[in-house]
């Protein structure tokens, strides 16, 4: 039987506010346990929550960016459940009247097509604390620093049909919230976490299958692996005569499998009711208009502009616009270096390789956009060749200065003197007289392969400094003269 996969995602994004959603406590990551928890966060009797307006503003920014309906009147509700890191015994969230309603996000698939993914809603809520198991023998510690950190939970429609589509959607959300500046997107620190709802159904069937939720997956790679593992588990289970049970599962990356955590709760299990300590939030049109006018250029618009303004391919434009920092870096390089396609190649390939090797982001790059742009100018004015440019780039990355100073100090300036190149080529051909005779006796097809040998010898003799274009032109004339 052929199966169709149905995937919906819930993405929890920690909003980049300076203080928590209902208290004045700081939200700094990595502080000593329980040093950033106020009486409100601890759930002490007699204290009242006060809503952080910045969290509301950030949620509205996101809603406008995905062309969603903004709830002009939205209500906070208590989500009741027991867990050791939830001191109040309930979580303040939103249920019937969320701040962000239906919207959509377009994602680019591997074959270049665009698919629209529906967003059901996005609502504000407070994060829970954190259970600490590693540092305690036979017991669990509780760190409430995270309790009360503002979250925007983004709930998609079940519109994805493969793990790769799901990853593309998460990457699009990740890029968007970073562009907006509402979340740092640091998945390793838990700033963006994903719950994956997965089900299968016979191909052509309209009714959804029984879904399982995989909780708290925190990397793009693990999202793909967890979903694929769960898909295979469900297929094997059904084809062996079993039934999928609706439940919450965890992904074990070491075993590459999901395992049962608990039966899946429904909304009525949490006994939601409006929080009596918080008034309904009324959002005025003027507040939204101020936010709308301040929205930055978003990834889809930037991709479109990169293609039309710089003549980039759809692939290159999507890669460069995948983060706001990378897009800004690229445009600064173009502003100085002038050639957009050359800049795109260096940013994506050479700089990208360096960043991967060092394990850092582009905002920590050891080569600034100004330095790279300056080096590209030297390629364009034939001061250095593309090959020598790699040596210059490595030196800049090692902190040896800008391109001009490195070229001067290392004597890397390209040889463009026709007389000097001509003399050098005569010496190369004299040293390879036998190959010259073979070249001249060969047919056109063999000559093409042999010509590369002479070019290589010439560049070796000049230590890579000879202008490649001049070498090719003069060499061809000498060999065929």
Curated annotation (Swiss-Prot):
EC number(s) per entry: 6.3.5.-
Keywords on record: ATP-binding, Ligase, Nucleotide-binding, Protein biosynthesis
Catalytic function, reaction form: L-glutamyl-tRNA(Gln) + L-glutamine + ATP + H2O = L-glutaminyl-tRNA(Gln) + L-glutamate + ADP + phosphate + H(+); L-aspartyl-tRNA(Asn) + L-glutamine + ATP + H2O = L-asparaginyl-tRNA(Asn) + L-glutamate + ADP + phosphate + 2 H(+)
Biological-process GO terms, alphabetical: glutaminyl-tRNAGln biosynthesis via transamidation; translation
Superkingdom in the source lineage: Bacteria
One Gene Ontology term of the molecular function aspect: glutaminyl-tRNA synthase (glutamine-hydrolyzing) activity
SMART domains with a match to the protein in the record: GatB_Yqey
Alphabetical list of Pfam families matching this protein: GatB_N, GatB_Yqey
KW Transmembrane (keyword) present: no
Protein function: Allows the formation of correctly charged Asn-tRNA(Asn) or Gln-tRNA(Gln) through the transamidation of misacylated Asp-tRNA(Asn) or Glu-tRNA(Gln) in organisms which lack either or both of asparaginyl-tRNA or glutaminyl-tRNA synthetases. The reaction takes place in the presence of glutamine and ATP through an activated phospho-Asp-tRNA(Asn) or phospho-Glu-tRNA(Gln).
Protein family: Belongs to the GatB/GatE family. GatB subfamily.
Subunit structure of this chain's protein: Heterotrimer of A, B and C subunits.
Name the record gives this protein: Aspartyl/glutamyl-tRNA(Asn/Gln) amidotransferase subunit B
Origin organism lineage: Bacteria, Pseudomonadati, Pseudomonadota, Gammaproteobacteria, Pseudomonadales
